[in-house]
Amino acid sequence: DGDKAGETMAIYYLRDRFDLLDSGTLWLSETPDRPSRGWDGACNRTMTWAELRDRTSGKTFFYFNTHLDHKGKTARAEGVKLVVAQIAAIAGKTPAILGGDFNTPTDSPIFRPLTKTMKSARDKAPETDREGTFNGFGSAPDTIVIDHLYFRGKLKCLRFATLTGDYGAPYISDHYPISMTFSL
């Protein structure tokens, strides 16, 4: 809800490796600067971002994390357009990574605005997989891919992975984590 309850798009980073230069959250709605629900969305949805500097190389990049609505088709389509516009406005020409639960398969036309400016880590990494990302706590077919990582700028994507291990429990979420190894 933007105050004390609801969804959060946390970004975790290695504090001994990266300096946090700036960060923020916006809402996937017609009023992104304040807590709100967009279009035909069932829930308030957000995008969180962080500007990070690598302490080793001194290079900076942005990481954006989002979660598109699970019910509203218009909310997903408009959410992608807003995400693309906000990445351009916030990151400028600085390298950027976008990750999240898009609640949409890769071949959906809603990705067109995104794929004009960013590349799919799953498709571009020399080491990759074709594992499904949504498991529904064991109730979904294991071929559904609705979680994605995209990148742009002077980043080299080295590896993409869907982390399907059980970590001591069969399912830690209804989605499997995904990961991208990259160099700046």
Which residues are covered by each model-predicted region?
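Metal-dependent phosphoester-hydrolase catalytic domains
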Residues: 17, 74, 78, 87-97, ...
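Short histidine/acidic/glycine/proline-rich micro-motifs that form metal-
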Residues: 2-3, 69-71, 104
